[in-house]
Regions:
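Cysteine-cluster motifs in flexible loop/terminal segments that predominantly coordinate metals
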Residues: 10-42
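An acidic- and aromatic-residue-enriched active-site/binding cleft used to recognize and process polar
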Residues: 33, 111-114, 139-141, 180-182, ...
Length: 236
């Protein structure tokens, strides 16, 4: 507390602070004041870079200036080359191999959830993710169909969410999601809380294909991603 008060009462900004905290829990209002000197592709963008701060302290600010012997994985090598050339990296063979894992029918699925500090419904826990909406695009033989569900009411959305998903989701085909950890964990919680759906949910889980894989492995990488495979960076 004393340290914080010293900053508040100081007529000048403190020295540059640890960048890892500048976006938590949300982006700092004076982030650009501290870090505006960094180039567009800077060392803190290095993918999975546990030594980013050390590199910065050694005077390495630009990503293109990072020595190759400081890199620790294949993604960093790709990222460094893209930073130097400004070109997009595409591994067509790896992407083709990934696409062969998709079934003839593709079910592209996305959930939206809400959570409450104080549980709203019986049998739920604080901050438990409760799905209330889904978007489903089904591709079959070149044709596309869109299905959706949005809960309308103040009651527990999960029973009707599950019923609608079971009705609209095809019985076979790949269930394609982006960053599968979210959807799979929500589905597992639903199977636990609604055991009558457990067998069906477990069948869906076995069909999930994670579209994030080609991007997290940098089989496709654009320098504007800044070392991230999040959908917010990939989608544009």
């Amino acid at each position: 507390i004393a340290f914080l008060w010293s900053i508040v009462n100081s007529p000048t900004f403190p020295n540059t602070v640890e960048k890892n905290y500048c976006n938590l829990p949300k982006e700092c209002l004076v982030k650009k004041k501290f870090w505006g000197f960094l180039p567009e592709h800077h060392v803190f963008h290095l993918y999975n870079g546990r030594k980013n701060r050390k590199l910065f302290d050694e005077g390495i600010h630009a990503l293109a200036d990072v020595p190759e012997d400081k890199l620790s994985n294949a993604q960093q090598v790709i990222q460094l080359n893209c930073a130097k050339t400004g070109k997009i990296h595409i591994d067509k063979e790896k992407i083709k191999e990934f696409l062969t894992t998709l079934d003839k029918v593709e079910c592209h699925l996305d959930f939206e959830t809400c959570s409450f500090a104080l549980p709203e419904f019986n049998g739920t826990r604080p901050y438990q993710r409760l799905p209330f909406q889904f978007s489903l695009h089904v591709i079959n033989n070149g044709t596309k169909k869109h299905f959706e569900y949005l809960h309308d009411g103040k009651d527990d959305p999960r029973p009707t969410f599950l019923a609608a998903l079971k009705e609209m989701l095809p019985l076979d085909g790949s269930v394609v999601v982006y960053s599968q950890g979210f959807e799979t964990s929500v589905l597992r919680e639903l199977a636990r809380d609604f055991p009558e759906y457990a067998s069906w949910v477990n069948g869906v889980l076995k069909r999930i294909v994670d579209l994030r894989v080609p991007f997290s492995n940098f089989w496709y990488y654009n320098p504007i991603q800044h070392g991230s495979a999040s959908i917010k960076k990939v989608l544009p």
